Amino acid sequence: FFNYGVGTNEDSNISSTVLIDLKGNELSLYKYKGTQFIDNIEEVATTFTELKEVMYNRYKEMQINGDKLYKGKPIYVVIDEVGTIGTYHDKKIRDAIFNDMIELFQKGRACKIIFLIFAQKCDSTNIPSNVLTNIQSRILMKTDSEFNTNSMIGTKEQIQNITHIDVANFNKGRAITKDGITSETSLIQVPYVSENEHRNIVRHLGHSLKN
């Protein structure tokens, strides 16, 4: 809400937001100005193609101005349960999306196309390994999966250098972050908001951002 200001393009700190939820039940709450909600995979493929074109245009602008980092507003792409893409039956569409994701991950950050992806399990079962390796910064929340812990942050011994609390016993809002550039890890505590309170915030503050 803060980044969107009062809902006008001039007041917002964000160019636009793309919310992808192929299960279609959670991110559909946020149908605001400058926000595109997607719940079908064909539209995901189309949107990623369009985002690549935006990325190329931003790079051209950066080259003309001699900038290493795009000076305009960022575009955020939020994908809930990214592994759902890997279960889609059409291999051609599925592979095209993952290939576009790799290119956008590799090149998009400098021109402020930022991806935030969420998954219950981070392995190559539903997400190709070459996609996973191009995810730079990572966040590990409460989990009893040793595989998730290893793939996101590191071994149990490495975790113990960060915190003495077992990841499986983390409080709500507790997480370990890993910086994609420096590989530095940090233990953080995010304020926890209950589902009911969250829905109240969406209802009371979201009216000024509605389309």
Could you say what each language-model-derived stretch is?
Residues 163-167:
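C-terminal boundary and immediately downstream tail of ABC-type ATPase nucleotide-binding domains
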